[in-house]
Amino acid sequence: MSEAASESRTNATEYTVSEISGALKRTVEDVFGNVRVRGEISGYRGPHSSGHAYFALKDDRARLDAVVWKGTMSRLKFRPEEGMEVIATGKLTTYPGKSNYQIVIDNLEPAGAGALMALLEERKRRLQAEGLFDAGRKRRLPFMPRTIGVVTSPTGSVIRDIIHRIKDRFPLHVLVWPVRVQGDTASAEVTNAVTGFNALAWDGSIQRPDLLIVARGGGSLEDLWGFNDEALARAVAASGIPVISAVGHETDWTLIDLVADVRAPTPTGAAEIAVPVKADLEATLASLGARLKAAVLRNFERKRQAARAAARALPSPDQLLALPRRRLDEATSRLGRGLSVSVDRKRARLQGQRLTPATLSRRINEARTLTGRDLARAQAAFFAIVRERRARFARTATRLSPAPIARRQKLQADTLAALARRQDRVISLRLERLRGQLSQAERLLTTLSHKAVLARGFALVKNADGAVIKQAADVVSGMALTLEFADGTADAVATSGAARPKPAAKPSTKAKEPGNQGSLF
């Protein structure tokens, strides 16, 4: 039996690690060459700079690594996201370098509209909680924009419909930012377009739009999924330029419809909302002009009738001018007579004052005299001012000379030194008085202290609690006592509880015999 087992092991095919890994790879790829796997996206990383995306598909019991190559990513109808439930179509393969397996995805689609709707509702709740859908933050559209920016695909019927509708209603300048409106990069391109239009300067070479239209034709939920991107919704909400959302048909809705300032049912409807009808405006202006002209004419006719009525109430011009004409004639006559009289008077005065050389010489001398007197007065006043200013400068120079300043400094220094000496004397006297008071207090304390009494040979008796015993009646036989002397304390025990009665008076001055002396305790 043992020999058979040994022979069986010897006859088993021997593989190298590379051979067995290759055999497993071929087996897996042959058996699972085309599979559909349903799971939740986990650990989504991508697309990387290479264009590939790596993640895992998982359920509640297992996990499967997955990869989407660059070419497949560009064909996807939606952008994969973390937590999204999808159905992946592809083939299983192994990676011999790490002995693991993965699915290479050829197609990826959401696991039904329910999964996308659940994700969309979750985003909607989050953005609504932040107030991005509030009507109070939405801006009014300009009535007549000069430039409109359109974010859409450069090909297709959407851009043609918008431009055609604007041209029919009110031709103006249209800027088109071409983007993809479907696929994995659609949301990023539309986001960049919205932020790019907002980054344009008002006085730049490219005219900044007054209004933005983000448009796309109709489609399924998966086709419109790029317009449900959270980053795009936030960019539209933060736009400084009013935005009209025109994505899909009237029954479709996306996140940017909720954050945009106005939602149009269709791209054509967005163009109709964006600009008024030029013919209607012209008709309105013509009507208003006619009404204004009629109002002006009516007002003019009223004023003319009022002027005519006032003219009829006024007297005739001849009656109004008769009195002023008479006054003018009288004034003219008086003026002529007055001029004649004045000329005659001036002529007579001139004849009476002949300009002889003597007269001219006298007048010149008088003028010289007056001029000399005025000049002398001016010189005297000038020199007086100069003397006063010199005296003022001299007084100022005297006050600012070094000698008075030095004297003032010396006086202040002497005063300060005298004050310092007085302060020292006051402090010394104060200290001496305080020392005397301290000595008196010390002597009084010594006099009143029981230490002085103890120093004269007395003792202070205390019980065990430290209380002073003042009477013999307070002593009990056997009581523990403490005797305090001037140089220390001693413990003692009372041998009797009553003291001897004190004699009323001494019978004689004879000293007692030593044997008759009573006990202190």
From Swiss-Prot:
**Some GO term, biological process aspect, for this entry: which one?**
DNA catabolic process
Q: Where is this region: Disordered?
A: 494-521
Q: What is its EC number?
A: 3.1.11.6
InterPro entries xrefs: Exonuc_VII_L, Exonuc_VII_lsu_C, OB-fold_nuc-bd_dom
Q: Which PANTHER family match?
A: EXODEOXYRIBONUCLEASE 7 LARGE SUBUNIT
Query: Which family does this protein fall into?
Result: Belongs to the XseA family.
Question: What name does UniProt use for this protein?
Answer: Exodeoxyribonuclease 7 large subunit
Species name for this entry? Mesorhizobium japonicum (strain LMG 29417 / CECT 9101 / MAFF 303099)
